[in-house]
Amino acid sequence: MLTLPKYLRSELKKPLGQLYKSIDIIEEKLHQQLSEDKLIISIGDATTKNLIKLNIQPQICIVDNKIEREPVEHKLTHTDNLVHVNNPAGCITDELVKICIDSINTATSNNPVIIEVKGEEDLAVLPCILNAPKDTFILYGQPKEGVVLVCVNEAFNKAKHFYKQLNKE
């Protein structure tokens, strides 16, 4: 298991990609990504919910059934392919990494995967960036600001830099 050192918390609160006020602004870009059969990974319940409202079905959705730490009930019904994993806040478990990699290798538009995290899913962005194809889009919410669009090829080195600084336990 990897844990987030306190000194990295403020750094990881900064967007790893381009921040947009709304998913609507990049809707066309996301539909294009799907039409080219390129991977979209959604991290977070609000982001996933907003994508599905726009009829954008990410091949991988990583959720924890909370929005801003408050329980949320939603119905992700675009797939029966549901995987459960425990991942404490401020951590990246080996199991989460394995499930992210397995999902990246198997998920398609016709076979999407929902990863339901018991704990917190926020740091899943790092193993996703490090293991996804370079043309993958990863989206996650930036609380009170909007949504972050991460282009893996642009964020890989930054994610690798952060990942190396996590504490191994």
UniProtKB/Swiss-Prot annotation:
BP GO terms, sorted? coenzyme A biosynthetic process
- Its domain of life reads Archaea
Describe the reaction catalysed, as an equation: 3'-dephospho-CoA + GTP = GDP + CoA + H(+)
Q: Does the keyword section mention Transferase?
A: yes
- Reply yes or no: does the keyword Transit peptide apply: no
Binding residues annotated for GTP, in chain numbering: D45, D64, K66, E121
Function, in words: Catalyzes the GTP-dependent phosphorylation of the 3'-hydroxyl group of dephosphocoenzyme A to form coenzyme A (CoA).
**Would you identify the family this protein belongs to, as annotated?**
Belongs to the GTP-dependent DPCK family.
Q: What is this protein called?
A: GTP-dependent dephospho-CoA kinase
